Amino acid sequence: MKKQNMIKNSGYKAEGFIGQYQKLVREVVIPYQYSVLNDELPDVEKSHVIDNFRNAAAAVRGEDTKDGFYGMVFQDSDAGKWIEAAAYSLQNCPDKELEKTVDEFIDIIADAQEENGYLNTYFTIKDKEKRWTNLLEAHELYTAGHLIEGACAYYEATGKRKFLDVMIKNVKHIYNHFVTENHEGFPGHPEIELALLKLYRITGDRDCLELCKKFIDTRGVNTDFYKQEKAKRDWTVWGNNAEDNYYQQSNAPVRELEKATGHAVRAVYLYTAMADLSGETDDEELFAACERLWQDITERKTYITGAIGSTVHGEAFSTDYDLPSDTAYAETCASIGLMFFAARMLEKEVDGRYSDMMERAFYNTVLAGMQLDGKRFFYVNPLEVVPGISGVIATHWHARPQRPGWYGCACCPPNVARLISSFGQYAYGENEDTAFCHLFAGGKVEFSNGMKLTCETRYPYGFAVTYKIEKGGKLAVRIPSWSESYLVLLNKKPVRTEKIKGYVYIEVADGDTLIITLDDSIKTNYPNTVIHDLSGKVALSRGPLVYCFEGVDNDNDVLSIALKSGGKAIVTEISDLPCDSIAIGVEAVRKTSPAGLYSFTPPLIEQIAAVGVPYYIWGNRGENQMRVWMDEI
């Protein structure tokens, strides 16, 4: 059974660092993204998402719209994620104009639904006869999942049922196809599984639970399914290898999986649903599989920034310890999915391993996925960039040195928006008698067990976290694994505490003040020697933030810099940081080589002070070199 549940988004009102990000999403990101979805911006990649729904609605009315679809086969999913982000934002801060915009969008979506409940603009517009014939590539179930999530969030935010009822009808259609009529199959891109569990908890309809369970339980049982499916059709979307079961996470029944393989986002979305289902049904065998997969990812396949999926080939996991910096794929959505997975594991087992990884992924890769102005986005998050190579040559084309305004495949931008807007669901949890503080997020929190508190902190730049207790009880606060020392004060008096799997448990009463002070030192991180790409390199971090070195702060050349072993590192300020951030200065040397490609003459050594900035803000001051892992001398 679950040890705790994440709070509902409505229970958290953000302030401080998270509050500023939620304000940015509310005031800039959500309106900007709607303008993109509605094709209103001339200088960014066209989305056509809303027009696809309009054209599908016309097709439902009997009009000829075969040329009316534009974009990826899963383009509808952007609508679900954007509505979900808007819904969370409405919970955080009511906005009648935004609500009106969402309602109008929902009207268009509802008009695109067919009488039998089917809802997918690609097939409604292009070819109704081919629906449900290409689960591997066509992603009908994936797009349905994101629309379900959007509908659930909007219902919880507003109480309005229209979108929820549309998706309930759609799920009944899907249930009829896969359960009642017993058609074989499971999603090529997992997502609907986790969405069905959300819908089940809202509606109580056990058909949702049964359908989720069928998709998970049948996955990988018939390892020839995608091959057999391909043999029955004469068309393809991507030309995927239907026999690559490791890429599709269908190489074995899910309870037998040992290694995280294949497309990274698909994998962690699947594992999220598996972990959630294990908690919902007390399936310990399923949870044991999740634990094996978690260990494989975090102990062998995760970047220091909380990024996963190291290879561009298939946006996938590579082999163990293959974590290149300059060709890293490290998709933003994959780190978001890793946070989803961590949150569900944390519900089943309160362990700081999971919340530590949520924090690492969020404050580094997820935040790096969006420009500080909220209008440009990274799909790929390399740990080293060299202009003229990155984003240019064939081996590095994916690792762009600057964030684009949008993408033809725009899964990441609305994903970032919905995660930031729902941050409370990851920061805080609860059970009958305990309030859990998993991440340090300033603001007011109300728990369903009656506890109430206000968190005050400058985190991630300040390391004192104050909890002012309005309604008391038992409080569980995570002590991050990176904090080698910490101090706990209750009403200004030190409290002796024992860490239990990374958490301290303290009884607090109405009116109490609890202060947790964490380690604020700058730390040198050394990679395991089995990571071939990182031999002789180090990375710096402070708190949850990994630091990088950009050319703009270092005479436009970070490749020639080596950090001094044992060198002094200090907190510093630089005038042109694009946000309220803190830099670090560290003793280093610059190597200057003689002319020629190779030489018998060693480089000249100059003593310098190198400047590092938080990884999440890189690329906000123009195109220049960037490196996380630095040579050490």
Report residues per predicted region.
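Solvent-exposed beta-strand/loop surfaces of large extracellular or lumenal domains
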Residues: 483-507, 524-530
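Active-site neighborhood of glycoside hydrolase catalytic domains
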Residues: 189, 196-224, 234-308, 312-319, ...
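Well-ordered alpha-helical scaffold segments within catalytic/enzyme domains
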Residues: 18, 83-96, 145-160, 193-205, ...
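C-terminal beta-rich recognition modules with glycine/proline-rich loops and embedded aromatic residues
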Residues: 10, 212, 290, 356-364, ...
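Carbohydrate-binding/catalytic loop surfaces
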Residues: 45-72, 120-139, 190-202, 229-263, ...
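Low-complexity, Ser/Thr/Pro/Gly-enriched N-terminal "stalk/linker" regions
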Residues: 1-78, 103-123, 161
